[in-house]
């Protein structure tokens, strides 16, 4: 089964994807992670991607697809998280899957009001040494632990990220709606409740 997780930053896509990976054996493909890993390892594709990133440019679609092909499992269930972001990427992904005799089964759109996203993200704090993520309201850091707020998590930056997300993703939502595979998840609910909705969509995950 192939799933695509769509939704604004702070919708909890990563949390749900990690849980499905752990409990149902899905392979979680996060393009952010595979890009960082390829760049760190200095693979040929990673070196190419790094050139674009250093210039502050978007990594081209064909390069991202090539990176995905490298980590795509021979068989099993897969979640794409943070990809595709555009219709062009969705078409490229469909083409890649078709060659393997596969297709996207469900696209889960994690819907959450802006004010919830802003509260979730602007409260996030990170321990720069361990990468551990905390939240001032929901999961405060233990006393004495030094934490920082990422630039990305400042309210004015979050608003901009939400605007960009909307512009980019609206056509993509239409694309998957037309295919009849778009499923809406109410991501403003507590984590457990969101997970229950995800399981309802995918059945037992086979």
Curated annotation (Swiss-Prot):
It holds the Pfam family ADK. One of its GO terms (cellular component) is cytosol. Residues 123-153 are annotated as: LID. The keyword Kinase applies. The keyword Iron-sulfur does not apply. One of its GO terms (biological process) is nucleoside monophosphate metabolic process. It catalyses: AMP + ATP = 2 ADP. It is found in: Cytoplasm. One of its GO terms (molecular function) is adenylate kinase activity. It is an enzyme of class 2 (transferase). Residues 30-59 are annotated as: NMP. Pathway: Purine metabolism; AMP biosynthesis via salvage pathway; AMP from ADP: step 1/1. Keywords: ATP-binding, Cytoplasm, Kinase, Nucleotide biosynthesis, Nucleotide-binding, Transferase. InterPro entries: Adenyl_kin_sub, Adenylat/UMP-CMP_kin, Adenylat_kinase_CS, ADK_active_lid_dom_sf, P-loop_NTPase. AMP binds at residues 31, 57-59, 82-85, 89, 161. Its EC number is 2.7.4.3. Coiled coil: none annotated. ATP binds at residues 10-15, 120, 124, 133-134, 189. NCBIfam families: adk (TIGR01351), PRK00279.1-2 (NF001380), PRK00279.1-3 (NF001381), PRK14527.1 (NF011100). Belongs to the adenylate kinase family. Monomer. Catalyzes the reversible transfer of the terminal phosphate group between ATP and AMP. Plays an important role in cellular energy homeostasis and in adenine nucleotide metabolism. Consists of three domains, a large central CORE domain and two small peripheral domains, NMPbind and LID, which undergo movements during catalysis. The LID domain closes over the site of phosphoryl transfer upon ATP binding. Assembling and dissambling the active center during each catalytic cycle provides an effective means to prevent ATP hydrolysis. This is Adenylate kinase. It comes from Aquifex aeolicus (strain VF5).
């Amino acid at each position: 089964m192939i799933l695509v997780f769509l939704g604004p930053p702070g919708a909890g896509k990563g949390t749900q994807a990690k849980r499905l990976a752990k409990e149902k054996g899905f392979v979680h493909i996060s393009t952010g992670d595979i890009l960082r890993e390829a760049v760190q390892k200095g693979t040929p594709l990673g070196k190419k991607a790094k050139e674009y990133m250093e210039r502050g440019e978007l990594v081209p679609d064909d390069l991202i697809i090539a990176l995905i092909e490298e980590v795509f499992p021979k068989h099993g269930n897969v979640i794409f998280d943070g990809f595709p972001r555009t219709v062009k990427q969705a078409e490229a992904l469909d083409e890649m899957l078709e060659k393997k005799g596969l297709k996207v089964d469900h696209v889960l759109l994690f819907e959450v009001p802006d004010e919830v996203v802003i509260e979730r993200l602007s409260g996030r704090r990170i321990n720069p040494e361990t990468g551990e993520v905390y939240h001032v309201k929901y999961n405060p850091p233990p006393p004495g632990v030094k934490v920082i707020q990422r630039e990305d998590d400042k309210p004015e930056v979050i608003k901009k990220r939400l605007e960009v997300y909307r512009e980019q993703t609206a056509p993509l939502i239409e694309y998957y709606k037309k295919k009849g595979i778009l499923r809406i998840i109410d991501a403003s609910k507590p984590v457990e409740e969101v997970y229950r909705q995800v399981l309802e969509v995918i059945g037992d995950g086979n």
